């Protein structure tokens, strides 16, 4: 922001690359509040998942799930997909319950969301695998990039990694080491978010 000010920009559209409006999105809002009066016009776009389809708003959650589903492997009755999200100590952690509910509503069978640092945890989800006779598990991050959490917490060789825990429980595990930022359908949604922020900037400039 300081560089933009120094360069003489007067209109700024902030685009968030956050998945849900959690702690990092609060930081984005803080940046917006701190700098909005330093420019003639400034707007802030929403996170990947923000609106949930109520009160005539868009259903970002359903849109995102459908986009992620383009990378789901073909499933048999003994196969499950576990989607690893980050998790947050904030109230926005409730988004993951909404995501799971909409996954179920859309008819995706044996697809479960769990978190690294929130609820539900892997241990919360594992009983569902046993109850449904699952033998094969695909682990998939719901994060922009496949970084430390994906490579180590999810798919690492250490005994406390999610892959190791599941393998010890008798499951065949296949990690999918790609962030959702590589997903073309997700990229298209982020372009929509950027366009929304820009259009809001244009609207406030008239």
Please identify what each model-predicted range represents.
Residues 1-138, 144-206:
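Extended amphipathic ligand-handling, pore-lining, and cofactor/metal-binding catalytic surfaces
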